[in-house]
Amino acid sequence: MHNLIKDLKARNLINNITNEEKLKKALAENKGIYVGFDPSADSLHLGNYIMIMLLKRFRLHNIKTFALVGGATGMIGDPSGKSAERNLLDKTILEHNITKIKYQLEKFTNSQVINNYDFYKNMTFLDFLRDVGKLININYLLEKEIISSRLDVGISYTEFSYNLLQGYDFLQLYKNDNIAIQAGGSDQWGNITTGIEIIRKSLGDDNIACGLTINLLTNSEGKKFGKSEKGAIYLDENKSSVYEMYQFLINQTDADVEKLLNFLTLIDVDEINKIMQAHKENPALRIAQKALAQAVVVDVHGQQKYEQALHISQVLFNGNINELNQEEFNIAIKSLPTTKLDKDEIKIIDLLNLANISSSNRVARDFLSTGSILVNDIKVNDENFLVKKQDAINQEFSIIKKGKRNYFLIVWNKD
């Protein structure tokens, strides 16, 4: 067995393989592999990162890797895993998303990026029906879970056709780009096998087209990985700060962290086992979570940004916020729960309730009496203490700290 496949299995990444013998042959003959990415947003997120890492793993084994951006399929929307019709993207937005995602894929995977719109821009509807539609039987499509699961609630002809488009993509890549392997999440099995069937119908049984699916990355509660309470953690630091990504990863549960180390990092499996052993001996040190956060943040944003996120975290949880420089302060406050005020002063007890730091006056008094509340790093015990705009940082921000680790941002209205 190819060492790469052994590694993928050891990490429990592989969900299914269409034909393992064809996969071995494709790897032996130096055929390429591709993964499709949906341009539904203008940045990829941590949920996509497992497939980015898959391409990196293949590339490290000197296998040609390709990333396909759905310039055509993105106009329709993949029905896989959806219970209702997706909203269609405006063409201008779609083109913007494609440009941004193409840049990210080239940066993170060093793969050739292909836009599948190029396959269809000169094809008429009649061409598609004649050259693609005739290859696949309706009954074949109705047996697909992505189709059958939507029959009761309804599926448009647009989304019904998506399976054929993704399948035709594989045929074009197989014929023209020496690509024999398609990979995707486990929800892509139906689309991948349709592509293999289209190749078989077009080129005969001697083809070596094959597919492999990767286990979906879910947490111990069965929820898809990659979203915080505020939403997706994006790879674009203008949409999600490096600090937010670091915090999201460092706060993963003990139940999830070993899987995440295997799925999202290039750390050797034996080394991951050693990390987990050390972690289990003293879970409070969060050795595994620290290894995960460092590996992913350095890979996505670089060592310097990782060190900056680490410093912000250390200051917020162990030190004085005044230790942050201006850039670090601006990054930190973007991630904090925020309350806006259009007055010049407010009693601390009222502010604690207004900002949802406390649930009642009684709880607020408890926080104050036990010394749990700091305003701009000054401890406050008096419930009548006035928090004033004139004392705010740059007369714009006040930072409320509750306990050791909970920060809240107060934004004063500018005159």
UniProtKB/Swiss-Prot annotation:
> What gene, per UniProt, encodes this protein?
tyrS
Q: Which GO terms describe its cellular component?
A: cytosol
Q: What is the reaction catalyzed?
A: tRNA(Tyr) + L-tyrosine + ATP = L-tyrosyl-tRNA(Tyr) + AMP + diphosphate + H(+)
Task: Indicate the quaternary assembly.
Answer: Homodimer.
**Where does the record place it?**
Cytoplasm
Positions bound to L-tyrosine = Y34, Y162, Q166
- Biological process GO terms, please? tyrosyl-tRNA aminoacylation
The name of this protein is Tyrosine--tRNA ligase
